[in-house]
Amino acid sequence: NTSDPYPASTSPEMLAELVDLLRARGLRRIKVGDCSWNGALPTRNVARQAGITGAVAGKAKMVFFDEGSWVTVPLPGTFLKKVTVPEIALNVDRIIFLANLKTHFLADFTFGLKLAVGFMHPLERSLLHQERLREKVVEINLAVPADLTIIDGRTAFVSGGPARGRAEKAGLVLAGTNPLAVDVEAYRQLYNLKKQHQLEESFSADPFQMIQLSHARECGLGGETWPGYTCVDL
């Protein structure tokens, strides 16, 4: 996250609702983790400015990855052979990604899979952006796979992004346990929204013409059953 308001960064209100939902189901040892990019550190200050710290006060423990221990783990990736991630991320029961619905001027878009960059050590992120960014962000997920991905798409960036962009109402929230299926559906929704505003740009009607999603499928992040997903209105 940066200190920019939603949808550039996590909505404090949505985060608070998620924590309340988890607590209502009897969960108490809830940790909210984040790590900003090099130019915005320390994350503690960003979280306070963005309203994240206040949103979970008394409900969950804030964990600022840049203040903790890191572990370098090997990856079976094509473009990333190792990644340095927070030690705490490897020692939790479940990982929930709370992502937004928005375009990204370098990675095309940022949903759940792209959120995994937040687990990467800040000093490694500059190298990440030098080449093969779209493929590399996907491969980070091999180290810290999400058990549940939530896309807060009430408002979306339909151009620009990630910190500044054209915001339009999308009016949706997506959630699922299959990271590829969630991001594919998020892409379809964003593509339709961009088309509505005549902003298709380099986006394709076929999600798998986009490098992030095609590479995620190649990496097996959706398993073998992801094509059978269905959308259920709640």
Residue ranges: model-predicted function:
Residues 1-234:
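N-terminal and secondary-structure boundary signal
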